[in-house]
Amino acid sequence: MSLTAFFSRPSVVVAKDLIGANFFVGSAGGIIVETEAYDREEPASHSFRGPTARNRSMFGPPAHAYVYRSYGIHWCLNFVCLPGSGVLIRALEPTAGIELMQERRRTISLKQLCSGPGRVGEALGIDRSLDGRGLDQPPFRLDLSNAKACAISGTRIGITRAAELEWRFGLEGSIYVSRKF
């Protein structure tokens, strides 16, 4: 299945299917162990009120990055699915470029290195310049061959609207998730 076909599905399906995939930005990255799905029809999504300059990439083609700044501090990375929907990358198990990620994050703790969307962004060197870039274009590298469709699920973190939806997915038993399920 092509990347475009993989991401041309509902974000809830994609978020679950990304668990176990390998994702790298340049030489740094690891195994995706936690994701959250967002859809334009639910009020927690940045796209709920329609396209804006900030969320324009969420309405672009599937298999592209949507990068936004959270709390004015952290760059967060989403993978665009169907128009107005995407998957937030919440946590990775670091496997490559560990020293570089430790330098960027100013920590040596592997468990905390990419545990949470802001930490993922900082460790991978994510910034606004990557917004709208295709996931098949450098510096991105996404390998879906190890992805598992056996993810555990729970409610999303840090939201107040549509908080009851179990659209957070994780790799069962992983110590690298941002919060236990």
Swiss-Prot record:
Give the record's keywords alphabetically: DNA damage, DNA repair, Hydrolase
Please state what class of enzyme this protein is: hydrolase
Task: Give the organism the record lists.
Answer: Chelativorans sp. (strain BNC1)
Please give the name of this protein: Putative 3-methyladenine DNA glycosylase
Q: Which domain of life is it from?
A: Bacteria
Family under the similarity heading? Belongs to the DNA glycosylase MPG family.
Could you tell me the EC number(s) of this protein?
3.2.2.-
Q: Give the GO terms filed under biological process for this record.
A: base-excision repair
**GO molecular-function annotation terms?**
alkylbase DNA N-glycosylase activity; DNA binding
Secretion signal: which residues? none
Q: What is the lineage of its organism?
A: Bacteria, Pseudomonadati, Pseudomonadota, Alphaproteobacteria, Hyphomicrobiales
| InterPro entries, per the entry | Formyl_transferase-like_C_sf, MPG, MPG_sf
